[in-house]
């Protein structure tokens, strides 16, 4: 049973079956390979359409197998809950001034809840910091029906499926990249700041914004660089359990990043 709605769902969740916030229907086209990802992403005319297409993608066999196996086997703590078990679209404003880039959904976090950074400890830290900065309406993000709202921010990732060992292959990253390219195309006119959670997200942000020059700006926590067109990129260590437990990243450090990002993005 879904922990908020009390409805029963199969794991993985079938498109159009009533899951909170499910953007897809049984008729949503399904990308089965890299070429179809590129074609469908390139033709998406709105964030709503793009989210639906992303959420049913089956282009990477290893990722499809893993995300669905996790959804069926489950973690003991969530054995009584349905798992989303599908690709996770971006979440937040359709006209964001601040874009937050991660890496990929967590197996028992977003792969379970269907919303970016929701249902795991990394997300707990992230959303608490976003709330302290006035960028979301609640410090808690537990499921897709909890009423969380974004204040001119969007959270997304370059890989949409939970990968084994939290490590997508280079080929999987490449296959998935048209989804993020399309998302950037649809929101970039509004973006004034990007927060990259980790070095890979930093490199992706530089590519998205078409950063030129040699050498490229290097990732570091608190590093800020100008991407052109009035967009600033901020580096932030990923709020992983390891980084938080070891003190490499602290709540105060997160607060500093998001206060600065909010200021640079011009969010009230």
Curated annotation (Swiss-Prot):
Regulation of this protein's activity per its record: Product inhibited by AP-site containing dsDNA but not by uracil.
Disordered as annotated region, ranges: 1-29
Entries under InterPro entries matching the protein: UDG_Type-4/5 (IPR051536), UdgB-like (IPR044147), Uracil-DNA_glycosylase-like (IPR005122), Uracil-DNA_glycosylase-like_sf (IPR036895)
GO molecular function: 4 iron, 4 sulfur cluster binding; DNA-deoxyinosine glycosylase activity; iron-sulfur cluster binding; metal ion binding; uracil DNA N-glycosylase activity
Protein residues bound to [4Fe-4S] cluster: 57, 60, 161, 176
SUPFAM superfamilies for this protein: Uracil-DNA glycosylase-like
EC number(s) per entry: 3.2.2.-
4Fe-4S in keyword set: yes
UniProt KW keywords: 4Fe-4S, DNA damage, DNA repair, Hydrolase, Iron, Iron-sulfur, Metal-binding
Entry note: thermal dependence: Thermo-tolerant.
One annotated GO biological process: base-excision repair
Pfam families xrefs: UDG
Function of the protein: DNA glycosylase with broad substrate specificity. Can remove uracil from double-stranded DNA containing either a U/G, U/A, U/C or U/T base pair. Can also excise ethenocytosine and hypoxanthine from double-stranded DNA.
Family listed: Belongs to the uracil-DNA glycosylase (UDG) superfamily. Type 5 (UDGb) family.
Protein name: Type-5 uracil-DNA glycosylase
Source species: Mycobacterium tuberculosis (strain ATCC 25618 / H37Rv)
The gene coding this protein: udgB
């Amino acid at each position: 049973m879904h922990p908020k709605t009390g409805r029963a769902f199969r794991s993985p969740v079938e498109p159009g079956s009533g899951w909170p916030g499910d953007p897809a229907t049984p008729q949503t086209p399904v990308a089965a390979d890299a070429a179809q990802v590129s074609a469908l992403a390139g033709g998406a005319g709105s964030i709503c359409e793009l989210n639906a297409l992303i959420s049913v993608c089956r282009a990477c066999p290893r990722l499809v197998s893993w995300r669905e196996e996790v959804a069926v086997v489950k973690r003991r703590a969530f054995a009584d809950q349905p798992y989303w078990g599908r690709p996770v679209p971006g979440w937040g404003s359709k006209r964001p001034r601040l874009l937050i880039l991660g890496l990929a959904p967590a197996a028992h976090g977003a792969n379970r809840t269907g919303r970016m950074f929701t249902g795991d400890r990394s997300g707990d830290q992230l959303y608490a910091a976003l709330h302290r900065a006035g960028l979301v309406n609640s410090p808690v993000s537990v499921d897709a029906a909890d009423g969380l709202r974004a204040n001119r921010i969007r959270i997304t990732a370059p890989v949409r499926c939970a990968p084994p060992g939290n490590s997508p292959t280079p080929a999987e990253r490449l296959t998935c990249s048209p989804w993020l390219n399309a998302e950037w195309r649809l929101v970039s006119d509004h973006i004034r700041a990007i927060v990259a959670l980790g070095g890979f997200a930093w490199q992706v942000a530089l590519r998205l914004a078409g950063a030129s020059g040699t050498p490229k700006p290097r990732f570091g926590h608190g590093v800020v660089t100008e991407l052109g067109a009035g967009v600033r990129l901020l580096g932030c260590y990923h709020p992983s359990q390891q980084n938080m437990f070891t003190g490499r990243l602290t709540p105060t450090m997160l607060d500093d990043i998001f206060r600065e990002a909010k200021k640079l993005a011009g969010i009230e």
